[in-house]
């Protein structure tokens, strides 16, 4: 065995630069940790800035690889590429891991076999990584690889801020000493908001000064902060005031929490009129930060057939749960066609009150999970709002409980969502919540029932700016349901090319597959000033198959819809959005009254 003295050095890690704009201040490593460029080693800073200058001057790419999103990547082997492969020690017998440079014995630490440390919560992955080097020859290049692999193991173990040092030492005995310094919080800094809001955001972080930084805890706090649609918070790590400490920077962008909107949709039905006028407002901090309300009024243009009001409160609770309360009131008037006679003028009323209580769950980086519990009260004397043509002599009342699980997963190529909901009605709570009343409103239905639905969605980025979106919903039930609880299909949000909720059933599914073109800018083509827009075209295929549990003698076994079509999505700045879809029915639909020429679906909203 050769006796050697090791010169101190530290490991290098893979980093990527989110944008090569001259104002860029941070880099993001392969685990999603954003770090100030000033905190990088000098050689990595030089590579970043050299690549910036090369791109901005048009002289080529520079020393770092840059992808199509403008991310800069440092080759993980680059830092050790120039280090010697000469064998310093034939056989690595042991590794000693200590928390402070002062704990390193310059004369070496003979007699150690395997891995030695006195950390109370030493990550298992780090131990496995170090064990993989035991028994192998030692060189400067292999030691650099060990340092980088240890850093990687710490980060995949939920320790995002760690320094691994290899101080000068004697390794003649075959034992190498590593210094592992886990970052402890020095302070939380907030950028982008005024002083009063800074304190609120700082209080939402559960980590305290002097505590070690754990990515799962930090991610949970960040998910909570970003739950508000009026706020976007990015977290950045920076060196703290003292050795071994780290600052957390909450870089925050907020939007106006109060805005109102006007809109138009042709999402109605033939009986109630297809045109819909929308007016509403959102007041995100009506009762303080993250305590907001929203209101929407929906009607036909003449305010004759449909008048719908909905009010929603959403607010975070001090113990990190989320409360949503929805209330709606709808009145409808329609002329029901009667064969061989004049139409019959009827009116109906629908009332709903639905609180929801959501509990966020612990989840790894890139995931958001929560469970939700709720209750629904619904009162109705018609099914006109749900695509039917019936007004009843009595009013039905629904009292049902719900429970759900929701997960959103963000990965390197897109976003996936799954939403599972279950509903239970015990029945017989009031005179209008009885089997007799339910059977009168819907033959074969009872006031006690169970049903569940599952919604899934995947948004997938494709090469060259293309993208794909797949979504769908399915439902199962133990019996016939009232119209408000059935799954419906037809219209812009399920199967295009058909009237809204042209079919409905107790069970079944609908699904949609869309392919989007790369975005283009009309503003750039027309050379508009100070405005941004994005236009995408799409092609789609939609399908639905629905059925009832206890069918009447004249009901089909199932009803099916299929359509293909084209559409577009246009966003102009932050204030106008337009959707257009033309769907063409295909196949044998087994549904009466279908326009085989298809249907154009329009929706436009202007925000102020």
What are these regions (language model features)?
Residues 23-455, 459-511, 515-608:
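Immediate N-terminus of the mature polypeptide
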Residues 8-18:
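Bacterial N-terminal signal peptides
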């Amino acid at each position: 065995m050769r006796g050697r003295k090791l010169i101190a050095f530290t490991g290098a890690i893979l980093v990527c630069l989110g944008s090569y704009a001259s104002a860029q201040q941070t880099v993001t490593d392969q685990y999603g940790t954003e770090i100030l460029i000033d905190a990088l080693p000098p050689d990595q800073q030089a590579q970043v800035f050299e690549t910036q200058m090369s791109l901005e001057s048009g002289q080529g790419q520079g020393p770092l690889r840059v992808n199509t999103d403008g991310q800069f990547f440092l080759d993980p082997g680059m830092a050790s590429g120039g280090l010697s492969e000469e064998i310093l020690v034939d056989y690595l017998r042991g590794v000693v891991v200590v928390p402070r440079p002062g704990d390193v014995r310059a004369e070496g630490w003979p007699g150690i076999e395997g891995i030695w440390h006195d950390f109370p919560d030493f990550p298992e992955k780090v131990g496995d990584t170090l064990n993989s080097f035991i028994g192998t020859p030692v060189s400067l290049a292999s030691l650099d690889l060990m340092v980088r692999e240890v850093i990687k193991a710490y980060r995949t173990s939920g320790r995002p801020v760690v320094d691994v040092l290899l101080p000068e030492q004697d390794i003649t005995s075959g034992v190498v000493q590593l210094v592992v310094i886990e970052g402890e919080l020095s302070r939380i800094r907030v950028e982008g908001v005024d002083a009063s809001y800074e304190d609120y955001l700082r209080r939402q972080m559960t980590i305290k000064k002097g505590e070690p930084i754990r990515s799962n805890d930090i991610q949970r706090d960040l998910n909570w902060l970003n739950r508000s649609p009026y706020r976007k918070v990015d977290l950045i790590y920076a060196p703290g005031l003292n050795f071994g400490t780290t600052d957390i920077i909450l870089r925050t962008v907020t939007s106006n929490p109060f805005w109102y909107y006007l809109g138009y949709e042709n999402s109605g039905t033939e009986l109630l009129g297809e045109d819909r006028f929308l007016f509403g407002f959102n007041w995100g901090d009506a009762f303080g930060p993250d305590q907001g309300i929203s209101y929407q009024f929906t009607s036909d243009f003449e305010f004759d057939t449909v008048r719908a009001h909905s009010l929603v409160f959403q607010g975070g609770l001090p113990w990190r749960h989320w409360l949503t309360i929805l209330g709606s009131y709808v009145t409808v008037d329609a002329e029901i066609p009667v064969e061989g006679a004049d139409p019959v003028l009827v009116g109906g009323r629908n009332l709903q009150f639905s609180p929801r209580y959501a509990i966020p769950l612990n989840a790894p980086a890139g995931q958001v999970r929560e469970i939700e519990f709720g209750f629904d009260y619904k009162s109705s004397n018609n099914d006109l709002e749900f695509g039917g043509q019936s007004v009843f002599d009595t009013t039905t009342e629904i009292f049902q409980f719900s429970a759900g699980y929701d997960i959103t997963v963000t990965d390197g190529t897109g976003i996936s969502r799954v939403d599972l909901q279950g509903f239970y009605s015990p029945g017989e709570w009031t005179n209008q919540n009885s089997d007799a009343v339910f059977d009168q409103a819907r033959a074969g239905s009872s006031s006690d029932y169970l049903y569940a639905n599952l919604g899934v969605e995947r948004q997938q980025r494709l090469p060259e700016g293309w993208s794909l979106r797949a979504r769908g919903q399915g439902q199962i039930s133990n019996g016939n349901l009232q119209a408000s609880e059935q799954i419906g299909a037809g219209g812009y949000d399920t199967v295009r090319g058909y009237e809204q909720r042209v079919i409905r059933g107790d069970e079944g599914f609908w699904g949609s597959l869309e392919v989007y073109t790369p975005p283009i800018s009309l503003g750039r083509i027309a050379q508009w000033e100070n405005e941004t827009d994005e236009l995408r075209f799409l092609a789609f295929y939609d399908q639905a198959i629905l059925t009832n549990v206890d069918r009447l003698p004249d009901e089909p076994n199932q009803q099916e819809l299929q359509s293909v079509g084209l559409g577009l999505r246009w966003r102009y700045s932050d204030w106008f959005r337009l959707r257009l879809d033309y769907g063409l029915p295909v196949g044998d639909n087994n549904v009466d009254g279908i326009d085989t020429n298809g249907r154009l679906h329009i929706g436009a909203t202007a925000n102020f």
